[in-house]
């Protein structure tokens, strides 16, 4: 299957009317799969709240018969049930980052972690997203040199916090992953987080 349609939602922040309005624009368009690109089930306080919003998202897009992929945003990492939220998802490769093929297209998904340093006082020394990002250096290196990536006719990079064009003072992802991504022949990088539309042409921000 070379031609397909995917729906990508992000930064819903548990605001059901936003999802309803967005889905209303595409409800009559046949689609093959759905991606929730972070900050959709944010700041989960408990299992009941998390399950309610997960069920609503899946029900709205028909995830009983259409695959739905969930990427973690920085807000899914916060609040009392954030550690339990992980158990509600069947991640590709059982990690919060990974890759998969859809037809002749290769999708690579990265977990950018938090948008603040691990040393930020509100984390009380419990976070190690620096380690998570370093783990993904090894993942990326293997993925980009792998057969499935090289043989794909199109390649899509998905991540929540923009690797290019974010503008935050704290940008660890470009520092760690930039040299690998600079040589990677992705056709498009789709990110989220900023709550505003932006298009950055190839090469305009060091993006390949």
Located regions from the model:
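Acidic, histidine-bearing metal-coordination/catalytic regions of metal-dependent phosphoesterases
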Residues: 1-8, 13, 24-30
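Short acidic, glycine-rich surface-loop motifs adjacent to enzyme active sites
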Residues: 41, 144-166
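Flexible, glycine-rich surface segments
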Residues: 159-175, 184-186
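Active-site metal-binding motif and surrounding structural segment of the metallo-beta-lactamase
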Residues: 26-44
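Active-site neighborhood of phospho(di)ester-bond hydrolases with catalytic His/Asp-centered motifs
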Residues: 8-11, 33-39, 66-74, 156-160, ...
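Solvent-exposed loop/turn segments at secondary-structure junctions
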Residues: 12-15, 40-43, 74-78, 105-107, ...
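The substrate-binding groove and active-site-proximal loops of carbohydrate-active enzymes
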Residues: 8-14, 39-49, 75-76, 122-133, ...
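Extended active-site neighborhood of metal-dependent phosphoesterases/phosphodiesterases
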Residues: 1, 48-145, 149, 176-188, ...
């Amino acid at each position: 299957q070379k031609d397909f349609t995917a729906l990508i939602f992000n930064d819903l922040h548990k605001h059901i009317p936003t999802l309803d309005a967005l889905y209303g624009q595409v409800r009559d368009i046949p689609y093959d799969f759905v991606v929730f690109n972070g900050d959709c089930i944010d700041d989960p306080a408990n299992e009941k709240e998390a399950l309610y919003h997960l069920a609503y998202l899946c029900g709205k897009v028909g995830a009983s018969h259409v695959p739905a992929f969930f990427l973690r945003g920085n807000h899914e990492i916060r609040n009392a049930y954030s550690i339990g939220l992980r158990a509600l998802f069947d991640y590709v490769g059982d990690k919060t980052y990974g890759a998969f093929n859809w037809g002749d297209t290769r999708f690579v998904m990265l977990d950018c972690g938090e948008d603040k340093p691990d040393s930020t006082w509100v984390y009380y020394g419990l976070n190690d997203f620096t380690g998570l990002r370093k783990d993904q250096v090894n993942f990326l290196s293997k993925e980009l040199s792998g057969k499935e990536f090289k043989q794909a006719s199109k390649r899509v990079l998905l991540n929540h916090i923009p690797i290019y064009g974010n503008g935050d003072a704290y940008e660890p992802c470009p520092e760690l992953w930039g040299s690998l991504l600079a040589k990677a022949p992705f056709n498009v990088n789709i990110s989220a987080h900023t709550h505003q539309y932006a298009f950055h042409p190839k090469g305009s921000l060091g993006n390949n």
